[in-house]
Amino acid sequence: MDQALRRKTLERFEQHRRAWDTDEALRTLYGRWYGLVREKLPPHELGPWLELGSGPGFAKNVIPELELSDVVGAPWLQHELDAEQLPFEDGSLGALVLFDVLHHLPHPARFLAEAVRTLRPGGRVVMCEPYVSPVSYPVYRFIHEERCDMSVDPLAEAAGTGGDPFEGNQAIPTLLLRRREEVERRFPQLRIAGFQRFAGLAYPASGGFGRRTLLPMRLWKALLAIEDRLPDAVFRLIGFRMLAVLERQ
């Protein structure tokens, strides 16, 4: 990665850290979602928990035991590394956490192979990623800055994107989970141990990074409370996010 791109990436990290400090809706959502991730982690005694693509480092606020990493180093990160070429010994990790990372990887299948190699039996990959539903698709496809291409093969050698770490295809995680049998056939040491859809309209209404919440905070919290009571079947139609757990056999 050239120096100009490294500087650009670090600037984005800093922008996101400032947004975290000033945006209550953002902290609420991401705090909840990292809480969901924590619930799915294996016992820490199994081995280190490593987050890939930690970027601004929000995870430490909810899961202080996590070791943080990214392709570009920063003072709050413990490792600078490539998720597709992990610098760890075979069977040395307890968990790999990816939060909005899988859909940015140039070669998702290479990462899955590295997960098989580095995780101990019983170790887990826990991923919080975009979910493409009938309601979220037009938002991801036509409004969001990242692309959403449902035509790609998520296990193909060139499934993802390259170059800028912030480029991505938000369809990759959904496409991968739709091909569950193929994933488990190609990587028999990985079993899909959990899958959950969540986050309805309260997510885009939060404004995300760099935008103000679209509703008064009181109304936004009311919308979030309503969504908390909705069953999974509803999020099949309106969900914007997913949590997936892959367990090393």
Where are these regions (language model features)?
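Conserved N-terminal segment of class I S-adenosyl-L-methionine
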Residues: 1-84, 242
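Short catalytic micro-motifs in class I SAM-dependent methyltransferases
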Residues: 100-101
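Core SAM-dependent methyltransferase catalytic element
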Residues: 235-249
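Conserved class I S-adenosyl-L-methionine
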Residues: 125-159
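A short glycine-rich, Lys/Arg-flanked "PGG" loop and its adjoining helix->strand segment in the class I
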Residues: 109-124
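A conserved beta-strand element that flanks and buttresses the S-adenosyl-L-methionine
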Residues: 97
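Short alpha-helix
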Residues: 170-195
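Short conserved loop adjoining the S-adenosyl-L-methionine
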Residues: 85-90
